[in-house]
């Protein structure tokens, strides 16, 4: 009884090692990739950027303690940790519902915190962030 189970476990491990692969840009940047891929383009964050087939308009954190951004329009392994000055700026003016806003607003926010759109048309893109007061 133990031999078939051992064979099954060994087969599963072998199958997994042969047919699984890692796509480098599928995973979040690691400290090793930061060392291997130094900052370029003066270390400026590029927004929006494409990562894992998704578009991001601000700094993100995937499996990392701190937020990071891509240094290319399409993530190519070049990235950096975000400082306060790196976060995406509000897009003023922006269109929300039937109004144009030139400043942060509390409209539509349940908790009464001011927010802004990260694109000129919130109705279409629906990407936003809370404003720093």
From Swiss-Prot:
GO terms for molecular function: heparin binding. This is Binder of sperm protein homolog 1. It comes from Mus musculus (Mouse). It comes from the Eukaryota. CDD domains: FN2. Keywords: Disulfide bond, Fertilization, Glycoprotein, Repeat, Secreted, Signal. Transmembrane segments: none annotated. Residues 1-20 form the signal peptide. Expressed only in the epididymis. One of its GO terms (cellular component) is cell surface.
């Amino acid at each position: 009884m133990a031999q078939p189970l051992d064979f099954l476990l060994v087969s599963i491990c072998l199958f997994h090692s042969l047919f699984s692969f890692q796509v480098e840009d599928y995973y979040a940047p690691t400290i090793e990739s930061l060392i291997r891929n130094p900052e370029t383009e003066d270390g400026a964050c590029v927004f929006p950027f494409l990562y894992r087939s998704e578009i991001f308009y601000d700094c993100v954190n995937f499996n990392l303690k701190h937020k990071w951004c891509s240094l290319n329009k399409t993530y190519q392994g070049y990235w950096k940790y975000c400082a306060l000055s790196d976060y995406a700026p509000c897009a003023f003016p922006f269109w929300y519902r039937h109004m144009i806003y030139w400043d942060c607003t509390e409209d539509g926010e349940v908790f009464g915190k001011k927010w802004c759109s990260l694109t000129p048309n919130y109705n279409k893109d629906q990407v936003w962030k809370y404003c720093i007061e």
